[in-house]
A protein has these predicted regions:
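Conserved beta-strand elements of the Class I
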Residues: 141-145, 240
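Histidine-anchored nucleotide/phosphate-binding helix
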Residues: 151-163
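Reductase modules of NAD(P)H-dependent flavoproteins
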Residues: 169-272
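A short, basic/flexible loop-to-alpha-helix module at the beginning of a structural domain
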Residues: 114, 126-139
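Ferredoxin-reductase
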Residues: 1-120, 177-178, 203-207
Length: 272
């Protein structure tokens, strides 16, 4: 249906589901998406004007992607309740670009390249949804902690809870590198404005000089520690984590120091 750029390396991919087929979806689930054999020249990918400078400086349009056989990867679903009702599945696709200076020896991600280049009308082989990463049916306060495309399942969970009219307190800590890497900002600002039981803290670890960022800075686990140290009972909250492995490890160590037991922590590392 659409494949919209949200950050220099992140697109929101919206797929229309086959009519008449059951879609047993719960927020936090994922699907398996398959890239067929393909050849791709990144010069052929249309880049939004807002991100052309980032692409030019990084030299990403010089990359080429290819696969000689089908390859499948898991991607978390970023749906809001209305998306599923309209027969759509939403994903946050992060293009796995090689480290700077190593483009000639390390190819970009096989499946992420294919999905990043999709255009409206293209068909995608998909299966699912799957997964056990869901909000627990309790009355405890929920703390969501994400980074990168770890946004996807957490966004779905928050929208699911809002749609149910929950009165549970919810906090969302989201880490990005710079302002260009931050997305769905207006959406979460609006939720926070309309729902007093929801608050969110976007934090930038390396804001660009031109960002004029006045919000939280530093790594997300440090922001979580600073906020939850002031909480009367951080061990009584539930924690939902999704993001890069290094972020997950740092957050788990932070939560352990706060006295949070492992049974109160739920995490997923699909699609990161």
């Amino acid at each position: 249906v659409s494949n919209t750029m949200k950050a220099p390396l992140i697109r929101e991919l919206v797929l229309k589901l086959p009519e008449g087929q059951p879609f047993d979806y719960r927020a936090g689930g994922f699907m398996q998406l398959t890239a067929p054999p393909y050849r791709l020249d990144f010069h052929d990918i249309e880049i939004d004007e807002a991100f052309t400078d980032s692409w030019r400086i990084a030299g990403w349009q010089e990359m080429r992607g290819s696969s000689d056989s089908p390859v499948t990867r898991a991607y978390s679903i970023a749906n809001r309740p209305q998306d599923a009702a309209e027969g759509r599945a939403v994903f946050n696709i992060r293009l796995a670009a090689p480290p700077p200076g190593r483009e000639q020896e390390i190819p970009p991600g096989i499946v992420s390249s294919y999905l990043f280049a999709l255009k409206p009308g293209d068909e995608v082989q998909a299966s699912g949804p799957f997964g056990e990463f869901h909000v627990q049916p309790t009355d405890r306060e929920m703390v969501f902690i994400g980074g990168g495309v770890g946004m996807a399942p957490l966004r779905a969970m928050i929208h699911e809870q809002i749609g149910k009219g929950t009165t549970r307190k919810m906090r969302y800590f989201y880490g990005a590198r710079s302002l260009a890497d931050l997305f769905y900002v207006e959406e979460f600002d609006a939720i926070a404005a309309e729902h007093p039981n929801f608050s969110w803290t976007p934090a930038l670890s390396d804001p660009a000089p031109g960002d004029r960022w006045t919000g939280a800075t530093g790594f997300i686990h440090d922001n979580v520690r600073a906020a939850m140290q002031k909480h009367p009972a951080p061990e009584d909250c539930e924690y939902y984590l999704c993001g890069p492995p290094v972020m997950i490890s740092a957050v788990l160590a932070t939560l352990a120091r706060l006295g949070v037991e492992p049974h109160s922590i739920f995490n997923d590392d699909f699609g990161v």
